[in-house]
Amino acid sequence: DGTLMIYLRTSTDCHYVTYSYDAGETWSKPVPTAFHSTLTNPAFLRLEDGRILFFYNNSRPLPELDKHKVWPPLSNDEINGVWEDVFTNRDTNCVAVSSDEGKRWSGFRELYLNELRNTCDFRSSGSNSSGRDKSVHQFQAIELPYNKIMVHVGQHALVRKIIIFDVDWLYEKQRSENFQYGLGSVSTQVYLKSVSGGYRGFSGHCAWNRTNGAVLVPDPSGDHTEAILLKNTEDSRLYNNVQGLVWNFPSSAKGVVRIRVNVKGKGLRISLLDHWINPVDTTVSRYAQFTSIVTREQMCPAIWTEVQIHYDTLQKTALLYAGNLEAVKLEMQGVAPNGLCYLHLQTASDRGDNEGTLIKSFEFDMRSDAE
């Protein structure tokens, strides 16, 4: 009908939307959307058949530090918010699709994870000639023949990528992961205490160095496969000592997530969300739509116990099953108008868990309203 719509980059927790009904002469008052983002750039692509693709980050940064206590010290402009101190939500991005002019969205598939997300020289690697920002929140996309989309993400030479995907990928209803091909599909980074702040004439722009958190270890059965180990690492160089893992699945209002685990230490926090939260962010219990802690007392005698979460955001409830034990009912926090699309696993303790939890695999199945 000629209406113009813009999704705005903001410093809040979400994009804002504004409309123009007079070819851009005037715009409505911007209002919040349900699309999670902080200081990242969104992009739309109108397809030839009328559908709309929305590229954005769908992520939340780590909680703000007391900027007066940061060392080395920040500038006054960085303390007062004129410039940023650090970006911790720009290592992932996603794409959603709408068939009704943006009224409803589906997909929310993780498009690309920053390949530098675990590197201990994240701040200084590469040069400044191709951009100081080593993030993946910039998008340029075009439609190709045969239902394909080509999108360019990122700007720095070390991280930018050109990706081609099929639009049908956004309509898939299952996903699984067993780590036989590594950790490329999950976020596991932990942050090193680093220099904060913007560019000061040499490499480093609002970024912290990182290193590996969760790692692959031999399966206890000795079958030559591997499993992920999450445990506390008592290391004073780290931002904190928790470890975590974040994995994306197709968005759905109803679904089942299955995880094969062996909790050996102080417990595993399992959370389901509608957006990406850092693996080491301990505020996940506040922002997750569903969250619970599984303990070793709930494990089966066998090596692996299957934990299932059957969730329904329309009814605002979920049932958690661990092995053959009675289901635990979980109450939903907040809202999820676009359904859930992220599994977040994290050590339940921030220290002293040297045994940790082994994670063998996980899978997701979408459920329809009739199921």
Per-region residue spans from a language model:
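Asp-box/BNR beta-propeller blade signature and adjacent active/binding-site loops
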Residues: 1-185, 192-214, 234-236
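Intrinsic-disorder/low-complexity, polar/charged segments enriched in Ser/Thr/Lys/Arg/Asp/Glu/Gln
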Residues: 3, 51, 174, 254-258, ...
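Short tryptophan-centered beta-strand motifs in secreted/extracellular beta-sheet-rich domains
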Residues: 259, 302-322
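Short, aromatic/His-centered strand-loop micro-motif at the edge of beta-sheets
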Residues: 288-308
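Flexible glycan-contacting loops in extracellular carbohydrate-active proteins
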Residues: 327-360
